[in-house]
From Swiss-Prot:
Protein name (record): Dynein 18 kDa light chain, flagellar outer arm
Pfam families found in the cross-reference section: EF-hand_7
Annotated Gene Ontology cellular component terms: dynein complex; microtubule; motile cilium
Function according to Swiss-Prot or TrEMBL: May be involved in the calcium-mediated regulation of dynein motor function. Binds 1 mole of calcium.
Record-linked InterPro entries: CALM/Myosin/TropC-like, EF-hand-dom_pair, EF_Hand_1_Ca_BS, EF_hand_dom
First-listed, main subcellular location of the protein, grouped into a coarse class: other
GO molecular function: calcium ion binding
Binding site for Ca(2+) 1: 31, 33, 35, 37, 42
Keyword vocabulary terms for this entry: Calcium, Cell projection, Cilium, Dynein, Flagellum, Metal-binding, Microtubule, Motor protein, Repeat
Residue numbers binding Ca(2+) 2: 67, 69, 71, 73, 78
Domain of life: Eukaryota
Subunit structure: Consists of at least 3 heavy chains (alpha, beta and gamma), 2 intermediate chains and 8 light chains.
tRNA processing keyword on record: no
Length: 159
């Protein structure tokens, strides 16, 4: 089981004034009894209203991180943290998609199988006049030293 993170001290992305205003409106809309809390079902609906569609796993992770008292109800400050966590997860998903796109462009497969030639990576860097020491990067990433990079090796190289 993953360690519980103190998300109130965690470095989460800031929300813009517009995003905070949308959070207030969405929270108020779903806090029908004015109790200052919404339940998990209402949380999913509120997130959808804000254009966020987390998976069941994402919902579980977010709720377990913000529901400090285990009430299964979310207060406004916890709701804001949920939005921040979801925003952070979305950014990570976008980064993963960019990595996969680059892997495929270099010869890998969409299902993260296949491999890319280190020589092809080197020639692309040279073609775009990138001042990257490919050999030094690959030395750490190409674990089996076979001149190819698997998806995991390529992702490690970019991180």
């Amino acid at each position: 089981m993953a360690a519980k993170v103190d998300i109130f001290a965690a470095n989460l992305p800031n929300l813009t004034d517009e995003e905070m205003d949308m959070c207030r409106k969405a929270f108020a809309m779903f806090d029908k009894d004015g109790s200052g809390t919404i339940d998990t079902k209402e949380l999913r609906t509120a997130l959808s209203a804000l254009g966020q569609n987390p998976t069941e796993e994402d919902m579980f992770v977010m709720i377990s991180q913000v529901d400090q008292d285990g009430s299964r109800c979310i207060e406004f400050k916890e709701f804001v943290r949920v939005i921040q966590i979801n925003k952070q997860m979305s950014a990570k998903d976008a980064d993963e998609a960019d990595t996969l796109d680059a892997f495929v462009a270099l010869g890998g497969n969409l299902d993260k199988t296949g491999r890319i030639l280190v020589d092809k990576l080197r020639s692309i860097c040279e073609e775009f006049e990138l001042t990257v020491n490919v050999d030094r990067l690959v030395k750490d990433a190409d674990r089996d030293l076979n001149g190819f990079l698997s998806y995991d090796e390529f992702r490690a190289l970019l991180s």
